[in-house]
Amino acid sequence: AKIQQTATFNQGFMTTELVAASILDMNWHDLTSVEGIDVNTFEKEQMAKIGLIEEIIPRYRTTYFNHIFNSGYSAGYYSYLWAEVLDKDAFDLFKEKGIFDPETAKAFRKNILEKGGSDDPMKLYKQFRGAEPNPEAMIKGRGL
């Protein structure tokens, strides 16, 4: 039991810093021009807008947030959280129907695995799950 409890230790902090980094990423990529912008001031203003307290800083500060500037993650850092939402919500269906329920497994295979990127992801997910992903599953999984 104690080992299982460690899985949700400090998740409030970790979730907050991940959300803050995701918002910062989106805000940088929402700009039409960066000319004349002071990086530290911009970051501080963005974190103040969401009410982030000084004790919780974003996972990565702008000056070393390589994910959002040097890779395919531009304006997509949030995808870590979104993937977790999908994971937890999909698994909840398996738990509801039975982990080894053949119909649930078949629906997952036919609507998610077989289709890949061939259609709108939300459409495919809804065909599998019967509804849009529910973030509550992730929140519960994090012990929040």
What are these regions (language model features)?
Residues 1-144:
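Cation-handling catalytic/transport regions enriched in His/Asp/Glu
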